[in-house]
Amino acid sequence: MSIKTLQSLFERDLTKLKLEIESYQDESKIWVIDKNILNSGGNLCLHLIGNINHFIGAQIGKTDYIRNRELEFSQKDVPRTVLIQKIEDTLAVVNQTLNTLEEADLETIYPLIVFEKEMTTDFFLVHLATHLAYHLGQINYHRRLLDTAK
């Protein structure tokens, strides 16, 4: 997959993530869990921010980002404005990082072993884009299901 295509996918879905967080009518519902829904929209948002900043920003872009995965799922009641700023900052990191790459870099081995074996940078970036889309769908469903007046 080309760098431009990857940038387009990340831009599209991080923009949709921002829209989903903005679309909660009741900001407190961003953090609601219910029955078998164990992850709130807010925690999934924090998870995506952490995941992308770690695997793209820190590992490829050499940013100083330090991931705290446990906090992504335990932190609560982060203001919507902070989540939105973090999403915007994450998109900037993705674009800055991908802009430093040449197409040939996509065929190099990704710097970390993530799934117990080596993989190309291209493969892992596609994985990260599909991981983003997967959780984006969960957040959309969370919002439509739980952001209702009762």
Annotate each predicted stretch with a short phrase.
Residues 1-15:
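Extreme N-terminal tail/first-helix region
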Residues 7-11, 28-71, 112-150:
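Short, contiguous alpha-helical
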Residues 12, 16, 47, 86-89, ...:
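Charged, amphipathic alpha-helical oligomerization/scaffolding segments
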Residues 17-19, 111:
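A short, ordered amphipathic alpha-helix with a cationic face
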Residues 19-22, 26, 53, 57-60, ...:
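Charged/polar positions within long, soluble alpha-helices
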Residues 75-108, 123-132:
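Acidic/histidine-rich alpha-helical segments that form the ligand environment
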